A protein has these predicted regions:
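Single conserved hydrophobic/aromatic residue that forms the stacking wall/gate
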Residues: 1-13, 251-254
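Helix-loop-helix junctions within the multi-pass membrane cores of secondary transporters/permeases
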Residues: 98-169
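Short, hydrophobic transmembrane alpha-helix segments
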Residues: 46-56
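Hydrophobic core segments of alpha-helical transmembrane domains in multi-pass membrane transport
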Residues: 35-47, 62-72, 104-110, 142-152, ...
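Structural signature of hydrophobic alpha-helical transmembrane segments
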Residues: 64-68, 130-140, 192-200
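Cytosolic juxtamembrane amphipathic/interface segments immediately preceding
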Residues: 16-26, 88
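Juxtamembrane and boundary regions of transmembrane helices in multi-pass small-molecule transporters
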Residues: 7, 150-164, 180, 184, ...
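Flexible loop linkers connecting adjacent transmembrane helices
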Residues: 78-96, 121-125
Length: 256
């Protein structure tokens, strides 16, 4: 009993140490990402683009809140999404059921994309398409191509030919889509580089490739994000063929 209790105490101490170290790491990353932009804006605010004191105060407070939010968001994503992705990927492959890998991969791709903050921002800037229609279209695109990426790892298919084929389809569709949709389509591909999507997708690939024992398994675990980024582009291009009206980004004013 004493050894078990001591073991539990040691585990908790180790976990607390890991969390503290990760917290320091994420704090440094967030500060280094936000502070340079903050300094540039303040420099412009005191020189060529004067801002009122109230706006400057709001900006500084907002920047501090952004840093705090990024710390906890990235910490939570790394401590939860990455381990979960690896375990889910390994468990999916152990089932040895192709239909289950396809179904789970698609559902996970859709859900993780809907939760992506970048997608919510993008959807709010497209005036001609309802927010939920755009969000679901992009999510389905990511889900379909996440399945394709997982099957590529599973069967050891080379990445380069797939990228050539899919991007050829993208550029072919681009010729039949209204110009207003082109910018939206290619911007939507950036959704797969968000802080929620990237850790989970990469961890999922690592989990699946870890079950394979061949020499190419490690290399095949990469390339998931590059394939998944094609999904939103194709989805929005197809959406553009349905919505033939012009799309315009709403111009958000800095201050009402």
């Amino acid at each position: 009993m004493r050894s078990s209790a001591a073991s539990d105490v040691y585990k908790r101490q180790y976990q607390n140490t890991v969390v503290r170290e990760k917290m320091k790491e994420k704090t440094k990353e967030s500060v280094s990402a936000v502070v340079p932009i903050m300094l540039i804006v303040l420099l412009l605010g005191f020189t060529i683009a004067p801002l009122s004191p109230s706006i400057l105060v709001e900006f500084i407070v907002g920047a501090v809140l952004v840093i705090i939010g990024m710390v906890f968001f990235s910490l939570g994503a790394e401590l939860s999404m990455t381990p979960m992705g690896e375990r889910v990927g390994g468990s999916m492959l152990r089932t040895k059921k192709l239909w289950m890998i396809v179904a789970i991969g698609f559902i996970l791709g859709v859900i993780i994309t809907i939760s992506e903050p970048d997608l919510q921002v993008l959807a709010g800037q497209v005036a001609a398409v309802p927010n939920m229609v755009l969000i679901l279209s992009v999510a389905v695109g990511v889900g379909v191509f996440l399945v394709a990426a997982l099957l590529r790892i599973l069967f050891g298919i080379p990445l380069a030919p797939l990228l050539l084929v899919f991007y050829a389809i993208v550029f072919a569709l681009a010729m039949f889509v209204p110009k207003g949709f082109l910018a939206v389509a290619f911007d939507s591909g950036g959704v797969t580089t968000g802080p929620m999507t990237v850790p989970f997708i990469m961890a999922l690939g690592v989990g699946i490739s870890s079950i394979r024992n061949d020499k190419h398994a490690g290399n095949d675990s990469f390339g998931l994000v590059s394939l998944c980024s094609i999904g939103p582009i194709l989805a929005v291009l197809i959406l553009g063929m349905v919505y033939s009206t012009a799309v315009s980004y709403t111009h958000l004013r800095a201050h009402e």
